[in-house]
Amino acid sequence: MKTLILLIQFFTRIPLPVQINMDEINLKKGSALLPFVGVIIGAWNWLIFTLVALLMPLPVAIIAGLFAEIIITGGFHVDALADTADGLFSSRKRERMLEIMKDSRVGANGVIAICFYFLFYGSLFLSVPDTQQIGWLFFVLPIVAKGVTMLLFAKMTYAGSKEGLGSIFLGVPWWPVVIAQVIVLVALGAFFSYIGVIAYAGVILFTIIYRAFVYKRIGGMNGDTLGAGGQMGQLICLFCLVLLWGLI
């Protein structure tokens, strides 16, 4: 329970009135619970989307659902996506890329990445053939994002500074990664049957390609690339689901 509270405090803005000392060893072992942080985020997203959908048109409810995640996370990983785009696409050397990611200012690549991310994300939600599924998508996709993050933790080489937040998860054992994947697959299978499981295969393929690209550019992961990977992972999952629903 302490590990779950730490993970909630780490990945969300939920004000828990509990002070727990950071134990990196137990946090790494307990990282298998990370998808349950996705459950909490997803439940909040679902609630906001559902309430707004009762009063407003579907596009407005979708925007509200997307904004709900920014509220509960503080835009933590959206900022990481912008920083990653600014750094990796800066056409600079490794050291300079890492410096750019640390810069609190958002560059042109970051702005472009965020704009197209949400345009594509919103368009995919509007493309879901069964609108009754949209609420469940808002619930499940944050779980997928945490599953992708766990995949990126596996045998991770850390490229950031030793003081970086992502370094806490350096050396995560293999078994929490496997448990996290099982949780994600159960969630996708429960809500979207075999199509959800097939879609996650596409997410895993994306994660492998993304990981290889990042390692080639900066020699490993850092906090920004980890966060960006989770954000893009849930986008890819939605893309695969919409694609499969159109084909099957």
Swiss-Prot record:
Its main location: membrane. PANTHER family: ADENOSYLCOBINAMIDE-GDP RIBAZOLETRANSFERASE (PTHR34148:SF1). Belongs to the CobS family. Keywords: Cell membrane, Cobalamin biosynthesis, Magnesium, Membrane, Transferase, Transmembrane, Transmembrane helix. InterPro entries: CobS (IPR003805). It comes from the Bacteria. Its cofactor is Mg(2+). This is Adenosylcobinamide-GDP ribazoletransferase. It is found in: Cell membrane. The chain crosses the membrane at residues 24-44, 70-90, 106-126, 134-154, 168-188, 189-209, 228-248. GO terms for molecular function: adenosylcobinamide-GDP ribazoletransferase activity; cobalamin 5'-phosphate synthase activity. It catalyses: alpha-ribazole + adenosylcob(III)inamide-GDP = adenosylcob(III)alamin + GMP + H(+); alpha-ribazole 5'-phosphate + adenosylcob(III)inamide-GDP = adenosylcob(III)alamin 5'-phosphate + GMP + H(+). GO terms for biological process: cobalamin biosynthetic process. Pathway: Cofactor biosynthesis; adenosylcobalamin biosynthesis; adenosylcobalamin from cob(II)yrinate a,c-diamide: step 7/7. One of its GO terms (cellular component) is plasma membrane. The keyword Magnesium applies. It is a multi-pass membrane protein. Its EC number is 2.7.8.26. The keyword Kinase does not apply. Joins adenosylcobinamide-GDP and alpha-ribazole to generate adenosylcobalamin (Ado-cobalamin). Also synthesizes adenosylcobalamin 5'-phosphate from adenosylcobinamide-GDP and alpha-ribazole 5'-phosphate. The lineage of its organism: Bacteria, Bacillati, Bacillota, Bacilli, Bacillales.
